[in-house]
């Protein structure tokens, strides 16, 4: 049967399978219990997330831009009541305030490590913020890489829990409607950790 679409012409580049930007395209299928939360009228993160997902559960959330996406992280840590033994994140760009907060969490022992992936946009257009993150990670012996990255994923290993945050927001304070999924799932955690580690192993700066 003839295809209804010429993907190369209709949708732009459709390259053959292979490694690009440090990884091959990946997928994972997991079974989780879902909670849906439309929180566009809630005004802060404490009201937005009142309990953490149990293993095998995910919470799907729409927020109204009234809080900084990075503030989800210390709130999760507070609810969990334990320190983060493994911290990974991938984002297009960060604000200087969130870079400072992240390094402070490491210095206070809340984060055992930092594994950071950013977009090359940040490196070229927000060079002062990127350099703060770069030098901060390098001085502390932590890993950072910048490439053609637009993914937004955060991984938090806390005790026996494996929390994953996937969504539309960067680590910035832009007041926008955003969606994200907070999951507690070891398989999904290892899936994202795998491709992040591959990039950082090859291209850490």
Predicted region positions:
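PLD/PLD-like phosphodiesterase catalytic module centered on the HKD motif
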Residues: 1-205
